[in-house]
């Protein structure tokens, strides 16, 4: 009996082995393996890989690279990691695909490098899907108009330079004028807006990145944010691919029908990294030693930001690229390139920054070319004359420095403009809600603040914002919704604002 059972076991095992031999056919795996000819700063010259495609990933001992220059005898490769251990003669293997990055919800709340490797000391990122970092931008017929506002929580931007979901709005200014602070405040304001945020640090100092991450953690913003980091001491190749990897992560969420905000901080470092790589590869230099395709590398990046049609999910990718100017020269090469690519710009003036006017946004040099159509109707009604009044004030204030005598009308315009400027000032990391902004803007347009002494403007603003707690819930709902306010609503809000300003110099009569 035992022999029969043993025979059955062996017969079953051998029959499965025979079946497996019929099904499985041994195959030879063809691999192309080349060798390193020379190593430079962040690049390598490789020979022996004739089938390599442009931007294909190559495997080095202990790291990866991307085929950047395809020549007859050799390939120029940009290295994506430490190359101090590499030597001439080391083997290089083709991977057969372009560079990709892990995408998905597993990345939210994580700090990673452009390769998807965790930098936050936690477990590796595990994702079932990867996407190539370089993808064609959506076709024209796949795009929808920008019609939904992206609230930044910054009064001067939401009122005068509105940003829409799917827009590309450039932030530019000299060093240390608050560019990153504006982008960070915008991320903080998306807390209850169901927007996935991506902060891409491009060649930044480690201390600057740590400060941003700390601010995100303190304000509980890391729970809806992905941080993609390259530091200044990273290889130029890794810095170069960082914004493309971050955009691929954002495109995944956009294609799921979600709204995404991505901040590139900053593209000046990206342009310099690309210039360094191009010069190392001996590509012909052009203006300011940048290669001839410097415009193209930024346009193909920023054109991926859009608002998709409802048939494609209706998701959006809003881009806030940052670029640094030198000595207030917004007509320099890289800034003008980006101004022409984007849908508007927010310019931060070092002069205003030195005067303590924060955020130091120069309204005269800032514009939003498509965001106005997405602005809430209640904002358009509240800010109808505000931009004109502020522009007139800025022009007249320049002439007052010459010490000439001013007529009554000019003095009125200047005093009104000073109160607009004071009311639009805002400390960092202090976003203002839609309802608070609307009542402030209505009070400014109605000139309720004109009787308030300048030194009391901070107190007056806080008093007006506090009356939001006393506004009927149905009126608050209309303010928050994308609806216009009728005359009765407007008068009710102005009455609340005027009441709050009693004792600070304002009068009921102006309401």
From Swiss-Prot:
EC category name? translocase
Compartments annotated for it: namely: Cell inner membrane
For molecular function, the Gene Ontology terms on record are: ADP binding; ATP binding; proton-transporting ATP synthase activity, rotational mechanism
CDD domains membership = ATP-synt_F1_alpha_C (cd18113), ATP-synt_F1_alpha_N (cd18116), F1-ATPase_alpha_CD (cd01132)
Q: Any idea of its EC number?
A: 7.1.2.2
* One Gene Ontology cellular component: plasma membrane
Sorted UniProt keywords? ATP synthesis, ATP-binding, Cell inner membrane, Cell membrane, CF(1), Hydrogen ion transport, Ion transport, Membrane, Nucleotide-binding, Translocase, Transport
In this record, what's one Pfam family?
ATP-synt_ab
InterPro entries in the record, alphabetically? Answer: Alt_ATP_synth_F1_asu, ATP_synth_asu-like_sf, ATP_synth_asu_C, ATP_synth_asu_C_sf, ATP_synth_F1_a_nt-bd_dom, ATP_synth_F1_asu, ATPase_a/bsu_AS, ATPase_F1/V1/A1_a/bsu_N_sf
Q: What does the UniProt record say this protein does?
A: Produces ATP from ADP in the presence of a proton gradient across the membrane. The alpha chain is a regulatory subunit.
Its name, as the record gives it, is ATP synthase subunit alpha 2
Organism taxonomic ancestry: Bacteria, Pseudomonadati, Pseudomonadota, Betaproteobacteria, Nitrosomonadales
Gene (name only): atpA2
């Amino acid at each position: 009996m035992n022999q029969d059972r043993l025979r059955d076991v062996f017969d079953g095992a051998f029959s499965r082995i025979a079946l497996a031999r019929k099904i499985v056919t041994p195959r030879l795996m063809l691999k192309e393996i080349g060798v390193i000819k020379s190593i430079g700063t962040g690049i390598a010259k490789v020979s022996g890989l004739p089938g390599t495609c442009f931007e294909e990933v190559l495997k080095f001992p202990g790291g990866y690279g991307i085929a950047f220059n395809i020549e007859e005898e050799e390939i120029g490769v940009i290295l994506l990691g430490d190359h101090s251990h590499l030597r001439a003669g080391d083997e290089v293997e083709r991977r057969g695909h372009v560079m990709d990055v892990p995408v998905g919800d597993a990345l939210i709340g994580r700090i990673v490098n452009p390769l998807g490797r965790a930098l936050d000391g936690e477990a590796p990122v595990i994702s079932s899907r990867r996407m190539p970092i370089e993808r064609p931008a959506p076709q024209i017929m796949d795009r929808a108009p920008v019609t939904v506002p992206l609230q930044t929580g910054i009064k001067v931007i939401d009122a005068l330079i509105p940003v829409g979901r799917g827009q590309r709005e450039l932030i530019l200014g000299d060093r240390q004028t608050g560019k990153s602070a504006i982008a960070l405040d915008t991320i903080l304001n998306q807390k209850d807006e169901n927007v996935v945020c991506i902060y891409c640090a491009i060649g930044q100092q480690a201390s600057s990145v740590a400060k941003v991450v700390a601010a995100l953690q303190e304000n509980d913003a890391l729970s809806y944010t992905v941080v993609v980091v390259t530091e200044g001491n990273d290889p130029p190749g890794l810095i170069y691919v960082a914004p493309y990897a971050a955009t691929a992560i954002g495109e995944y969420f956009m294609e799921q029908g979600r709204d995404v905000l991505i901040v590139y901080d900053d593209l000046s470092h990206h342009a310099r990294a690309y210039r360094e790589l191009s010069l190392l590869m001996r590509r012909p230099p052009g203006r300011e030693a940048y290669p001839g395709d410097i415009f193209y590398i930024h346009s193909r990046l920023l054109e991926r930001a859009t608002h998709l049609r409802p048939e494609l999910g209706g998701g959006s990718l809003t881009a806030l690229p940052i670029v640094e100017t030198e000595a207030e020269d917004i007509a320099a090469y890289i800034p003008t390139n980006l101004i022409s690519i984007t849908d508007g710009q927010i310019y931060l003036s070092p002069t205003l920054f030195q005067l303590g006017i924060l955020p130091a946004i120069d309204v005269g040099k800032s514009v939003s070319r498509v965001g106005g159509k997405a602005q809430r109707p209640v904002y358009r009604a509240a800010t109808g004359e505000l931009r004109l009044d502020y522009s007139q004030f800025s022009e007249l204030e320049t002439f007052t420095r010459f010490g000439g005598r001013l007529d009554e009308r000019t003095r009125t315009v200047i005093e009104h403009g000073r109160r607009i400027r004071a009311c639009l000032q805002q400390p960092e990391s202090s976003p203002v809600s839609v309802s608070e902004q609307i009542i402030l803007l209505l009070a400014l347009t109605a000139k309720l603040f004109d009787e308030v002494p300048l030194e009391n403007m901070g107190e007056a603003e806080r008093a007006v914002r506090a009356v939001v707690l006393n506004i009927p819930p149905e009126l608050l709902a209309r303010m928050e919704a994308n609806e216009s306010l009728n005359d009765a609503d407007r008068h009710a809000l102005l009455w609340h604002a005027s009441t709050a300003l009693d004792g600070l110099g304002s009068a009921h009569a102006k309401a």
